[in-house]
């Protein structure tokens, strides 16, 4: 993409309404525009990152054997009355009446609807286990929406639901989701720690939240520092192997890690003092096992091998897709702007032409643009007639992991400059070597 043809409405000054870094940089980098309290339009740069994150989520869900579908944003209130949650949910739920005077709601979650889909089409234990998921916009009428996409009223979320014949199978689904989430977050350049948490209005007696450590987090967290040394890495997982999934879950849940709602000071005190940590965290996902909480009242049952009919065991599993943008920025930025991890960057590298209009630099930039594209990479070429300082400031603000700088002096020596946004380190090399280096880096992402 050529920046001269791109829609990137960057702001020079910090917006007064932005209280935290991620909100400030998302507005300044032209990623979002507020349309109402807690409701945003996603502008091209922000939308591009959103789709990168969504793609990683899809890939890891499918890798784990989960099946995508799409449910509507509007739901009939009668489904929620069946489960007993329609009146319990409170004012966060946006209730709507259509022209036929039917009660509807803008879904904050989908347990009732997915249960209705299941009971309409599945009746035998032979069709289990089954896990369905979707990525869809949700709405919760927060009383005080703030912090940009971190606590908005409308948000994009992946929510998945497992249906299993018995407790043991449902716990395997729980473990499978935890393993899948660990891989998902690490691919995004995040360390998201699974922490024992409270279930809230969704219910159930087994739940973990995934939290990214950040000073702006809404939750107080307590943990053993040993957990921050764990890496998922490139291990290959057989998601059908119960023992393998259980072992990974034990590895990640053995060190103490809890939110303030479930914190146990006595247990925490048994950890060596030098490893005890308290901090704040941003919730980016949560997994639940809630047994027959929804299947029993809503009649989601299957016939077993002996002919008896039993309610299925269920769980739900969510990832805050739009919230992840804010969490990534909170965890990865400096005083110049965003620093995107390679896995979610909107463009793989920026090309800066130091002397637009000079035939040698123009030709070199065009060749770089063409060669990077031919290797399957997406460059952002700053071909504007702007001073070099303004171009560097824009690149630093939007946070592309790599920048290639092209100028007349370097071209005369057959060199370009490749700069790492995170470290600030620069290296001169040929254009071909720069293309090869970037292709190698992204081949491993």
From Swiss-Prot:
EC numbers for this chain: 6.1.1.15
SUPFAM superfamilies with a match to the protein in the record: Class II aaRS ABD-related (SSF52954), Class II aaRS and biotin synthetases (SSF55681)
BP GO terms, sorted: prolyl-tRNA aminoacylation
Transmembrane annotation, as ranges: none
Xref: InterPro entries: aa-tRNA-synt_IIb (IPR002314), aa-tRNA-synth_II (IPR006195), aa-tRNA-synth_II/BPL/LPL (IPR045864), Anticodon-bd (IPR004154), Anticodon-bd_dom_sf (IPR036621), Pro-tRNA-ligase_IIa (IPR002316), Pro-tRNA_synthetase (IPR050062), Prolyl-tRNA_ligase_IIa_type2 (IPR023716)
Enzyme type, top EC level: ligase
Keywords, ordered alphabetically: Aminoacyl-tRNA synthetase, ATP-binding, Cytoplasm, Ligase, Nucleotide-binding, Protein biosynthesis
GO cellular component: cytosol
Reaction it catalyzes: tRNA(Pro) + L-proline + ATP = L-prolyl-tRNA(Pro) + AMP + diphosphate
Described function: Catalyzes the attachment of proline to tRNA(Pro) in a two-step reaction: proline is first activated by ATP to form Pro-AMP and then transferred to the acceptor end of tRNA(Pro).
Record-linked HAMAP family: Pro_tRNA_synth_type2
Subunit: Homodimer.
UniProt similarity note: Belongs to the class-II aminoacyl-tRNA synthetase family. ProS type 2 subfamily.
The protein's name: Proline--tRNA ligase
Taxonomic path: Bacteria, Pseudomonadati, Pseudomonadota, Alphaproteobacteria, Rhodobacterales
């Amino acid at each position: 993409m050529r920046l001269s043809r791109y829609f990137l409405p960057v702001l020079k000054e910090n917006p007064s309404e932005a209280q935290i870094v991620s909100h400030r940089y998302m507005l300044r980098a032209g990623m979002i525009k507020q349309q109402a309290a807690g409701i945003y339009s996603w502008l091209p740069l922000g939308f591009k990152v959103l789709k990168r994150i969504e793609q990683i989520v899809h890939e890891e869900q499918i890798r784990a054997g989960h099946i995508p579908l799409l449910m509507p944003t509007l739901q009939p209130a009668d489904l929620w009355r069946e489960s007993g949650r329609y009146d319990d949910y409170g004012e966060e739920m946006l209730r709507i009446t259509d022209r036929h005077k039917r009660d509807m709601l803008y879904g904050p979650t989908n347990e009732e609807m997915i249960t209705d889909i299941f009971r309409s089409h599945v009746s035998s234990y032979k069709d289990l286990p089954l896990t369905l998921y979707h990525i869809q916009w949700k709405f919760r009428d927060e009383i005080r929406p703030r912090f940009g996409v971190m606590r908005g009223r409308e948000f994009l979320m992946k929510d998945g639901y497992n249906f299993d014949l018995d407790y043991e199978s449902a716990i395997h689904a729980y473990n499978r989701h935890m393993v899948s989430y660990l891989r998902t977050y690490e691919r995004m350049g995040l360390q998201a720690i699974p922490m024992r948490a409270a279930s809230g209005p969704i219910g159930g007696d087994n739940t973990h939240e995934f939290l990214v450590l950040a000073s702006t987090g809404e939750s107080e967290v307590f943990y053993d520092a040993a957990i921050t040394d764990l890496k998922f890495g490139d291990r290959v997982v057989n998601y059908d192997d119960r023992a393998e999934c259980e072992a990974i879950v034990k590895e990640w849940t053995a060190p103490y890690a809890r939110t303030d709602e479930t914190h146990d000071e006595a247990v925490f005190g048994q950890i060596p003092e030098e490893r005890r940590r308290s901090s704040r965290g941003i919730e980016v996902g949560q997994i639940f096992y809630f047994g027959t909480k929804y299947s029993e009242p809503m009649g989601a049952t299957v016939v077993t091998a002996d002919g008896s009919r039993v309610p299925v065991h269920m769980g739900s599993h969510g990832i805050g897709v739009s919230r992840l943008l804010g969490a990534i920025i909170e965890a990865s930025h400096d005083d110049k702007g965003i620093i995107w991890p390679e896995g979610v960057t909107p463009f793989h590298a920026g090309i800066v032409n130091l002397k637009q209009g000079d035939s040698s630099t123009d030709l070199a930039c065009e060749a770089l643009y063409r060669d990077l594209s031919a290797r399957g990479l997406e460059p952002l070429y700053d071909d504007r007639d702007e001073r070099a300082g303004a171009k560097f400031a824009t690149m630093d603000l939007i946070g592309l992991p790599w920048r290639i700088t092209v100028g007349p002096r370097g071209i005369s020596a057959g060199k370009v400059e490749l700069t790492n946004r995170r470290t600030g380190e620069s290296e001169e090399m040929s254009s071909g070597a720069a293309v090869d280096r970037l292709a190698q880096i992204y081949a491993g992402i």
